[in-house]
């Protein structure tokens, strides 16, 4: 059974917490489906080309229908002309969102969490707190303390998951390139897969692993 590594206040290993048995044997295809769903939902639908009705000009017939020796033409906005409208071009009213049901979302999250635990990259701490926030409340101090926490983990990049994240914690991590801090309500399978390691507050971990199959 996979286990999360429990860290003390100095970020040293002091124990472990088991993941529920239902996390075993989940199909990885659920994570694939969720990643496709997530990326499609954040896709910016900005590509747009003008069709022949939207191109300016073309109010008169460019040349006589007969007698010129050229192919007949009714408007210079036709797609056959340079500067004319585009046929079958991109439109900005397309919906790229891919549907995924609640069960698949849950299974994708559980699979991603299980993968992190198997790789020994899932850590649990009592509290993700930045020292001195009451006394100093300065962004420079907050960032320095947050960076100390990140460096102590000795990980390439890290996702920090808080329960009821406060503004000081968010500010502290906001300028650090290789880590991200989020509230547990924002946690999803894509973020779990995107970061090489995950640090969760104990209450956030318990909230995530509780059985939601009946919800």
Curated annotation (Swiss-Prot):
Annotated region described as Disordered, given as residue ranges: 46-76
Pfam family, one: Ribosomal_L4
GO molecular function terms noted in the UniProt entry: rRNA binding; structural constituent of ribosome
Listed Gene3D superfamilies: 3.40.1370.10
A single GO cellular-component term on record: ribonucleoprotein complex
InterPro entries named in the record: Ribosomal_uL4, Ribosomal_uL4-like, Ribosomal_uL4_dom_sf
Keyword 4Fe-4S recorded: no
SUPFAM superfamilies the UniProt entry points to: Ribosomal protein L4 (SSF52166)
Keywords per UniProt: Ribonucleoprotein, Ribosomal protein, RNA-binding, rRNA-binding
Coiled-coil ranges (or none): none
GO biological processes: translation
UniProt biased composition (Gly residues): 56-71
Quaternary data: Part of the 50S ribosomal subunit.
The protein's role, per its UniProt record: One of the primary rRNA binding proteins, this protein initially binds near the 5'-end of the 23S rRNA. It is important during the early stages of 50S assembly. It makes multiple contacts with different domains of the 23S rRNA in the assembled 50S subunit and ribosome.
NCBIfam families: rplD_bact (TIGR03953)
Family listed: Belongs to the universal ribosomal protein uL4 family.
Identification of the protein by name: Large ribosomal subunit protein uL4
Organism name: Helicobacter acinonychis (strain Sheeba)
Lineage: Bacteria, Pseudomonadati, Campylobacterota, Epsilonproteobacteria, Campylobacterales
């Amino acid at each position: 059974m996979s286990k999360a590594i429990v860290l003390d206040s100095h970020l040293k290993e002091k124990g472990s917490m088991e993941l529920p048995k239902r996390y075993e044997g989940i199909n990885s295809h659920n994570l694939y489906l969720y990643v496709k769903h997530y990326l499609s939902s954040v896709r910016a639908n900005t590509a747009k080309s003008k069709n022949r009705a939207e191109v300016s000009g073309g109010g008169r017939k460019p040349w006589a229908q007969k007698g010129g020796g050229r192919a007949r033409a009714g408007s210079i906005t036709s797609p056959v002309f340079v500067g004319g409208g585009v046929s079958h071009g991109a439109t900005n009213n397309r919906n790229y969102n891919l549907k995924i049901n609640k069960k698949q979302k849950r299974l994708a999250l559980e699979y991603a969490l299980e993968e992190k635990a198997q790789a020994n990259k899932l850590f649990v701490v009592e509290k993700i707190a930045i020292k001195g926030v009451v006394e100093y409340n300065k962004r420079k101090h907050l960032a320095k303390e947050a960076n100390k926490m990140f460096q102590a983990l000795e990980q390439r990049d890290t996702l920090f998951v808080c329960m009821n994240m406060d503004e000081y914690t968010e500010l502290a991590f906001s300028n650090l390139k290789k880590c991200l801090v989020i509230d547990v309500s924002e946690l999803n399978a894509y973020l779990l897969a995107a970061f090489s390691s995950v640090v969760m507050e104990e209450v956030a971990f318990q909230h995530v692993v509780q059985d939601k199959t009946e919800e």
